[in-house]
């Protein structure tokens, strides 16, 4: 395998975890790029990122930089910043990209300003670069600690997807190639919304049966929207759909689940535990459903609760009194 230069942009938990797991293999030259020179210097010198990944040792093979010119010659560039920061990052770093760089978005969200998928946004900002997406069931802490993790990576060109999967995969981090960028992205965004729904049910003490019902009916909503927007139904049953939903809606490592639990308990919109992508994606997903004439009652209820337009008890009453239909 050819040694490649890989740059991960975004020194948060997920970006750092990806940089760590790729660098550990020592098959490629890997650099973590962030905007804070002081932070990047600390990471380089101390070899630990206590704020994002406490207790995880950063490998000697991993480089750190706050200088955009480190992107020169990079064949693969991972965008690991939050979804709402993608447009700014593309504009900031775009001029420094090598002409043949493949861009991989690693965020699980939808641009809330335009309602566009992140691959669409990046294609507008970086029109001369292939754009891929990495998504699936993987918590940053698990990835960084070398716990077995499998995710999906999708590109329009199957050859590009397979190259990325082969290049980035390692002993504990396995990627499956796909050409369904739409399905992989929507699965990653919608599972966050459904994890909030699962958390609301848990926080309100509505029981495991209600949680199972919301997750399964939410999965049906995910499938309908993915197909309506041009994705593949099979993707819903894969890592970026069902796999990520199971993880995010059941594990208390999930920020979205914890956020939902707080809502269910009436504690308000507490985002002190970190970024909650589903809180931004809910309203956008509901609008996409309306635009494509897709019935998405669970997603709409979550969006209304987050916006303060509906309380939990009323939301559950509305869901339970909807007209009876077939599954």
UniProtKB/Swiss-Prot annotation:
GO terms for cellular component: cytosol. InterPro entries: 6-PGluconate_DH-like_C_sf, 6PGD_dom2, G3P_DH_NAD-dep, G3P_DH_NAD-dep_C, G3P_DH_NAD-dep_N, NAD(P)-bd_dom_sf. The keyword Cytoplasm applies. Pathway: Membrane lipid metabolism; glycerophospholipid metabolism. NADPH binds at residues 14, 35, 108, 140, 255, 275, 277. It catalyses: sn-glycerol 3-phosphate + NAD(+) = dihydroxyacetone phosphate + NADH + H(+); sn-glycerol 3-phosphate + NADP(+) = dihydroxyacetone phosphate + NADPH + H(+). Disulfide bonds: none annotated. The active site is at 191 (proton acceptor). It is found in: Cytoplasm. GO terms for molecular function: glycerol-3-phosphate dehydrogenase [NAD(P)+] activity; NAD binding. Catalyzes the reduction of the glycolytic intermediate dihydroxyacetone phosphate (DHAP) to sn-glycerol 3-phosphate (G3P), the key precursor for phospholipid synthesis. Belongs to the NAD-dependent glycerol-3-phosphate dehydrogenase family. PANTHER family: GLYCEROL-3-PHOSPHATE DEHYDROGENASE, GLYCEROL-3-PHOSPHATE DEHYDROGENASE [NAD(+)] 2, CHLOROPLASTIC. This is Glycerol-3-phosphate dehydrogenase [NAD(P)+]. It comes from Agrobacterium fabrum (strain C58 / ATCC 33970) (Agrobacterium tumefaciens (strain C58)).
């Amino acid at each position: 395998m050819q040694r490649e230069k890989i740059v991960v942009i975004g020194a948060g938990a997920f970006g750092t975890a990806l940089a760590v797991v790729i660098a550990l293999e020592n098959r490629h030259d890997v650099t973590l790029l962030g905007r804070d020179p002081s932070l990047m210097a600390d990471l380089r010198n101390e070899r630990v990122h206590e704020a994002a990944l406490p207790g995880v040792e950063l490998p000697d093979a991993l480089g750190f930089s706050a200088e955009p010119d480190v992107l020169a010659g990079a064949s693969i560039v991972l965008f690991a910043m939050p979804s709402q920061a993608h447009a700014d990052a593309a504009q900031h770093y775009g001029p420094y990209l090598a002409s043949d760089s493949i861009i991989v978005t690693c965020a699980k969200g939808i641009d809330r300003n335009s309602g566009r998928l992140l691959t669409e946004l990046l294609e507008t900002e970086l029109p001369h670069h292939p754009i891929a997406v990495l998504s699936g069931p993987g918590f940053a802490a698990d990835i960084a600690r070398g716990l077995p993790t499998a995710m999906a990576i999708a590109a329009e060109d199957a050859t590009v997807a397979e190259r990325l999967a082969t290049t980035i995969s390692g002993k504990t981090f396995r990627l499956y190639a796909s050409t369904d960028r739409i399905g992989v992205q929507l699965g990653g965004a919608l599972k966050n919304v459904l994890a909030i729904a699962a958390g609301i049910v848990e926080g309100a003490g509505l029981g495991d049966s209600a949680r199972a019902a919301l997750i399964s009916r939410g999965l049906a909503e995910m499938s309908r929207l993915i197909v309506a927007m041009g994705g593949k139904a099979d993707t819903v049953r894969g890592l970026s759909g069902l796999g990520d939903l199971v993880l995010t809606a059941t594990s208390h490592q999930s920020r979205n689940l914890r956020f939902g639990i707080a809502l269910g308990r009436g504690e308000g919109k507490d985002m002190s535990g970190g970024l909650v992508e589903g809180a931004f994606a809910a309203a956008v997903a509901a609008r996409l459903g309306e635009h494509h004439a897709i019935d998405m009652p669970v997603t709409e209820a979550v969006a209304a609760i987050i916006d303060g337009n509906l309380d939990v008890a009323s939301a559950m009453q509305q869901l339970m009194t909807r007209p009876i239909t077939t599954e």
